[in-house]
Design a protein with these regions (language model features):
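Active-site mouth loops of central-metabolism enzymes
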Residues: 128-143, 227-232
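Glycine-rich phosphate-binding active-site loops on the catalytic face of alpha/beta enzymes
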Residues: 209-218, 248-262, 287-315
Length: 315
């Protein structure tokens, strides 16, 4: 089967909006929207191909870019690798050099545009931040509320309310308060009974690996349009998550952790290998913090997740 390597860009303006282009009607999947880019030539570095394509298509010069996600997609006649980079620094004013219509879109509104099927993971990656905060165990509700408030004020945009030692009624009350803090500012992910779905319409759900295995055979236990995530530790769990149609996962442990001493860590190379076989955004977890975000990007991850390293004031 023919193999095609494509470099594509999630171009982010200073206001946070993302640039998309509409495909010509006479091309394959014409009329659909896409992320700008083009084919990587033989022996051409991906970043160089990206810079060349964006200058040819949009008249801009790339000044700052980093890996975002790789998506593999099989068509009837070819296998395509979409090598997607986030570009948040460029010079020049973007315009359709070839006459193609362009649009600057708020990330949350990307889902309202029609893209080729292979672009769905890119849309999701463009909407997700690089950091994922998981709340720590053993804190009182007031301490958790205060910490989440500080985290949101500091710019954290994705938060998992994890409180395994709380009884359900206490967790539910806390989730109501935390949802209010996050409204319009951060995406809240809950870890509670799925029967609560209707009571938290703005929240996503993060499945434990045990829940993932429990629900996998029945399919996605969650409405489309709301974020579903899962905790994964190996290739089998990643395959289950993919079959369920999750929007993102955490993959752990990357490195040894204080919370699980003695548990074997994946290591960076194994994590990269697992990510390469998974087409959705992945947050690396376990022994990592904000300072490892760049290393995570280089290994194919969306970013990093953590508890201690992200909690305001530390633990």
């Amino acid at each position: 089967m023919k193999r095609v390597h494509v470099a594509a860009a999630v171009i982010r303006g200073s206001d946070g909006r993302v640039l998309i282009a509409r495909r010509p009607e006479d091309k394959h999947q014409g009329g659909l929207w896409e992320f700008p880019g083009g084919k990587v030539e033989d022996d051409e570095p991906v970043r160089a191909a990206l810079a060349r394509e964006l200058e040819e298509e949009l008249g801009i010069r790339v000044e700052r870019a980093r890996p975002l996600i790789q998506v593999r997609h099989d068509y009837a006649d070819k296998h395509v690798l979409l090598d997607v980079w986030e570009v948040d620094g460029f010079s020049g004013e973007a315009h359709g050099v070839e006459g193609q219509p362009l649009a600057w879109v708020e990330p949350r509104e990307l889902a309202d545009y029609e893209f080729p099927a292979a672009n769905a993971p890119i849309v999701q990656a463009a909407r997700l931040p690089a950091h994922y905060l998981i709340t720590p165990d053993g804190l009182e509700p007031g301490e958790l509320i205060s910490g989440v408030r500080k985290a949101v004020e500091a710019g954290i945009r994705l938060i998992q309310l994890r409180a395994p030692n709380m009884f359900s009624p206490e967790y539910r009350d806390l989730a109501i308060d935390i949802q209010g803090l996050c409204a319009g500012k951060a995406q809240l992910m809950l870890k509670g009974p799925l029967e609560w779905l209707g009571d938290f319409p703005a929240a996503g759900w993060h499945l434990t690996s045990a829940q993932l295995r429990k629900y996998a055979s029945a399919g996605r236990p969650f409405p489309e349009g709301r974020l579903l995530a899962a905790s994964c530790h190996d290739a089998e769990e990643l395959a289950l998550a993919a079959s369920m149609g999750v929007e993102f996962v955490t993959l752990s442990p990357v490195q040894p952790t204080e919370s699980h001493p003695g548990e074997p860590a994946l290591g960076w190379d194994k994590a990269a290998e697992l990510i390469a076989g998974f087409n959705q955004p992945v947050y690396l977890l376990g022994g990592v913090g904000p300072q490892q975000a760049e290393q995570a990007w280089e290994h194919g991850a969306q970013g990093v997740a953590g508890i201690r390293a992200f909690w305001p004031g530390g633990l």
